[in-house]
Amino acid sequence: MTTVERPHSIVVTLFLFLFAGGCGNRETQQQDHPRLSPKVTMTDVTFRSSALGREMPYRIVMPSSISPGQKLPVVYLLHGGGGGYRDWTNYSDVARYAESVLILVMPEGNSSYYTNSVEHPEERYEDYIVSDVILEVESKYPVAPGRPNRAIVGVSMGGYGAVKNAMKHPELFAFAGGLSAAVDVPTRPFSIKRVSQWRFHSSIFGPSGSETRRDNDPYVLARTVDPGRMPYLFLTCGEQEGLLPANRKLAEILQERGFTYEFHTGPGDHNWLQWNAQLPNVFRSLQERMGHAK
């Protein structure tokens, strides 16, 4: 376990804060200006998800040059609430990590929390991620087989989805990363100020105190699963974020139960500026622990 808390030392401009604003900005979400280099290729693909019963898109970024027979580890990148599958390439420089040794896959998750909905049982987004997307990608592209070569990372809602689904399906992933992960969503109490949000969360997770809530609660999972079977967990959160206490709480449980994990904090709020600052740490840790991504 490693816990790293960076000193307050970063000064940024107002322009960058506005550009990298929160993941709920639908106006910028509609634009598509991926940050790529000549060393990678990017493709948008649509496939039919059996779990959802409809066509779903994803974006895949790979090295421009892959040797015949070469197989590469894969990282599934989950977007945040209000965002979409293009966000990772539009608002971060994540594509550079695919220049030589990784395949990056960004599936569409809508506002699902990557969870099978209680109120709408046809919306099986957990099954879509852990079954359909993985099967689709790894049957079509030069992906190295097996758990040691597979990671899942997300921001905000996607961070929750990455951490939760990795703990529920530890046989699938060697590494899971949550950047500003909304790990407390299943346990948030009713608030008259946020009735619509509470109602939406209830439609996905079920009533407060229900079995479906507990089954999708990272705190409950962290207290009950076998730490020895879990993937390496990477958590990070900005020091100006409302989600910091929730992530600290999860890190404390991981520490108490002997998980292999690391937890980072640093200056920043709930936005891509802060997440971009953490990407080198994420991929350093990821590449140390995945199959051939050295």
Task: Please identify what each model-predicted range represents.
Residues A20-G22:
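C-terminal motif of bacterial Sec signal peptides marking the signal peptidase cleavage site
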Residues I10-L18:
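Sec-dependent N-terminal signal peptides
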Residues T2-V11:
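Bacterial N-terminal signal peptides that target proteins for export
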